Every structure is written in C-alpha cells, then in structure tokens.
C-alpha cells in the first residue's frame, strides 16, 4: 500500500501553539516501524492549475506570495511562511496522488487500480474556495475530487460515464468548506458525520449531514454511520470514495466532545473500507483532525486506521492477481 507524506516540511509555529504538528512524523515513524507492506512516498506539490479547480486564483496567489491579510492568517490558525505555503500544496498533492493510485489513473493513462491509498495528513475540509480556516489552507479532497473527474473524462470520454465522487467525512467537525465548494455540484456527494455543538458554529449544508450529541459513544455512532451509508447508497453511485478518517471523535480528544473508544473508531474505519470494498469502489483516505490530550493516543487511532486500510488494500491486491 502506498502512503504519501509531507511531515518533513515543518511549520515554524509559535511556542505553545495548540496544533499538534508532531503527530504526522510520529505516525510515519510508527507505520514504518510496526507495519510491513506500506511504501512511503514523498508528497508532490499541487500546481496552481490543480488548486484552481477548487480555489480562487487570488486566494492561491495570496498564499503563494505571502500577501494574505493578518486577519485571514488568524482565521486559518497558522502564521504565513514559505513552509506553510509549500506544506499546504504538498498536503493537496498527497491526496491527489493517493486518489490517482486508488483509481488507477497514471500520468500516462490507465494503470492497475490499487483500490486503497493514503495521505498521511490532509483532510483540510474547513478551507473554502476563497479562504482558509480551522488549520486548513487548501481543501485537498475538493481539489482531488475535481482533478480525478477531469483526468477520468480525458481518459474515458467516449467509453465510460463521468466519474462521481463521494466524500465521506468522519472528522468530528463538519466539513463546511467542502460542503460550500460542492453545494451546486451533483457529481460529488458530501457526507459529514460530526458533533452538533462543535466547530464550525455556523455550518454549511452538505448533501447529507449527521449531527451527533456531545458524549456520543460507540454504539450510537455506529448506528448513525450505518444509516448514513444506507442513505448514501440510496441517493448516489460513486466511482471513487475520499474518506476523512478523523481521530478527533476519540474519547481522549480535547476538541472532540464525543466518546468513541479505540475499538469504536476501528469499527468505524472498517465499516467505511468494507462498504467501499463490497461495491468495488476505490478509496483514498486522509487523516484529518486529531487533538488528543495525549498525542500518542491520536497517533494510535491513526495507526489503527492504517492497519484496517492495509487489510483492504490486500483484498484489492489479491483481486488484481486473480
């Protein structure tokens, strides 16, 4: 299984900043140390043209050239720096590359579908077309969805229907930027399962929003997820799934307000991967949020996601051999 990383582009954050930047390197180290069969690849940087599939040119230029207003930097939560701009491009590029591998779209045409591939960061779902927010600069899943649709159309214009993409966002915070970008796009289905009383406090309308009460535990969460997947299946037929596997519904997360256990989050991940596998839908996933009081707990949740993902990548690999 291929996984794309960009943790070597470290943001120069002020002392005491609440974003746990170290989690990305910690996760990569544990995957390398504890798993075999995962190939680590450096994330490519998304180009201006790729970013423009989901973002306004003026906003892209402001991030690139450091002309972003101080108020906009505060809304994002990161001070501007060259490293911030580069890392944001790499985070998008990682999800694009993972989606391309999962779907089997190579730079020179069709390649064998991997079925499952990973971005070891990403899930920057609070970024709108014209602005960032909530530690999100560019919206990686929005760019990836649009770019995969464009590449699919170029390759299969006269032989297959257009590519439809389902974004399954299980970060504890609503994917407001993603919902806004695809508000009038029937070819992309946005599903968000999130805390009702959590950030963002002014939410957008996804194609399907599932709001959960504070303190929601494993059983209630899984019931809600099952209903959501049934509704997705009833309303939409995706050819690609982009999965935001947020670690922040975990009971030890300081920003999450839900009470899922390790077992509950592993069951959540398994249900999503299995849902896609049973329908033979390629899936690219990213890590999204995770703000554990103990950073090692966040990393453990994410490592468990990788272990489940690898099981389903193996199923795809076996099918490809046969």
What spans do the regions from the language model cover?
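Charged, often glycine-rich, active-site loop that binds/positions anionic groups
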Residues: 46-68
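Acidic carboxylate-rich catalytic motifs and surrounding loops in phosphoryl-/glycosyl-chemistry enzymes
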Residues: 38-48, 284-293
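Hydrophobic residues in alpha-helical segments
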Residues: 31, 54, 63-64, 99-109
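Glycine-/proline-rich flexible loop or hinge segments
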Residues: 8-13, 45-49, 71-84
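Short, flexible active-site-adjacent loop segments at beta-strand->alpha-helix junctions, enriched
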Residues: 7-9, 57, 123-124, 194
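A general "terminal functional-core" signal
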Residues: 70-322
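N-terminal low-complexity, Ser/Thr- and acidic-residue-enriched intrinsically disordered segments
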Residues: 1-46
């Amino acid at each position: 299984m291929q996984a794309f990383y960009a943790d070597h582009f470290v943001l120069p954050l002020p002392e005491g900043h609440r974003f746990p930047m170290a989690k990305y390197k910690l996760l990569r180290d544990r995957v390398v140390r504890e798993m075999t069969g995962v190939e680590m690849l450096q994330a490519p940087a998304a180009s201006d043209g790729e970013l423009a599939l989901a973002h306004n040119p003026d906003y892209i230029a402001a991030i690139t050239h450091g002309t972003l207003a101080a108020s906009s930097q505060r809304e994002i939560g990161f001070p501007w720096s060259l490293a911030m701009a580069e890392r944001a491009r790499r985070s998008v590029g990682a999800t694009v590359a993972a989606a391309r591998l999962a779907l089997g779209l190579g730079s020179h045409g069709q390649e064998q579908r991997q079925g499952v591939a990973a971005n070891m960061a990403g899930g920057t779902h609070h970024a709108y077309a014209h602005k960032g927010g909530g530690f999100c600069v560019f919206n990686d899943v929005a760019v990836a969805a649009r770019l995969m649709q464009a590449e699919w159309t170029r390759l299969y214009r006269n032989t297959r229907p257009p590519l439809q993409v389902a974004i399954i966002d299980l970060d504890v915070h609503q994917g407001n930027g993603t919902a806004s970008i695809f508000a009038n796009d029937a070819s992309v289905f946005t599903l968000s399962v999130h805390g009702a009383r959590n950030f963002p406090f002014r939410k957008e309308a996804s194609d399907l929003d599932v709001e959960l009460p504070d303190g929601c535990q494993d059983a209630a969460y899984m019931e809600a997820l099952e209903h959501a997947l049934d509704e997705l299946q009833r309303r939409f037929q995706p050819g690609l799934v982009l999965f935001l596997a947020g670690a922040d519904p975990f009971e030890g997360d300081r920003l999450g307000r839900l009470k899922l256990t390790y077992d509950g989050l592993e069951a959540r991940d398994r249900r999503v991967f299995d849902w896609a596998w049973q329908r033979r839908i390629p899936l690219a996933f990213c890590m999204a949020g995770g703000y554990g009081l103990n950073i090692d707990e966040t990393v453990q949740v994410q490592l468990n996601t990788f272990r489940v993902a690898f099981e389903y990548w193996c199923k795809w690999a076996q099918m490809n051999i046969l």
